Amino acid sequence: MISDMPLVCKRFPRSAKYNPDWVLASISGAANPLWLSEWLAAAMELQPGMRVLDLGCGRAASSIFLRREFGAEIWATDLWFSASENMQRIRDAGVEDGVFPIHANARSMPFAAEFFDAILCIDSFPYFGTDDLYLNYLAHFVKPGGRVGIAGAGLMQEVDAPPPEHLLEWWTQDLWCLHSANWWRHHWDRTGIIDVEVGDTMPDGWQFWLDWHKKVAPDNHCEIEALEADQGRYLGYVRLVGRRQGSVKLPDNIETVATQYTKMPLLRTAAT
């Protein structure tokens, strides 16, 4: 039992209802998926019956939470974690009527255009969303006027090379995908595809990150020491929410190009 885990928090009253042992058994990364889901949902205006894509859902804890708390229908989509295991977790939580596990790559999803009323991504968007072309692809799946929202680990200010000395030991090459809320806002705003409504950071987000990490990964001294040394100067949680602009024409999502082979001579014939 881990009943002493810091899950009972006034900042996240919905999350505090869930058994800490269940939360720990359902995590798939370094962040508390319920805290981030509750924080993001506060800016999303989710309603019962909405079709929602939970992109990069991990082990579907966020999907179960969103279904139970808001009554939306959730497509729990992830590449790294088994849809079959997620189905067991969903069934045990009693929400199989409204949470549907999907195994898919974020860059090759099996959904119809404009199928979703909203798209959420909890602590996974930097893995694929920094690509300049990705928002063009993702926006196809949400209805015009529908919201797209992301929340997860990020930066309070951009990091230049080399990283600050107090982060050097922890900072690996993959962490260059982390960005600030202002960076994400610019990344989306410039396309015209999304009208950004919210771009902010969680107050004391670094402290929540640190407290959670001390409980779930106490042996990860490198990350814990980096957070303690940083004190929120660079590290924390970021959130971005915007609506798809219906007036913007999206480029086609091209997966294959139909061609027909025509056999032709390889070399020029000698002049006679």
Model region roles, listed by residue range:
Residues 176-192:
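Short alpha-helix
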Residues 194-220:
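Conserved catalytic loop of SAM-dependent methyltransferase domains
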Residues 53, 59-108:
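Class I SAM-dependent methyltransferase SAM/SAH-binding core
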Residues 31-48:
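Conserved alpha-helix/loop element of class I SAM-dependent methyltransferases that forms part
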Residues 107-119:
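A short acidic, Gly/Pro-enriched loop at the edge of an enzyme's catalytic core
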Residues 132-147:
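A short glycine-rich, Lys/Arg-flanked "PGG" loop and its adjoining helix->strand segment in the class I
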Residues 224-272:
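C-terminal lobe and adjacent flexible extensions of AdoMet/dcAdoMet transferase-like proteins
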Residues 153-175:
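Short, glycine-/aromatic-enriched active-site segment of Class I SAM-dependent methyltransferases
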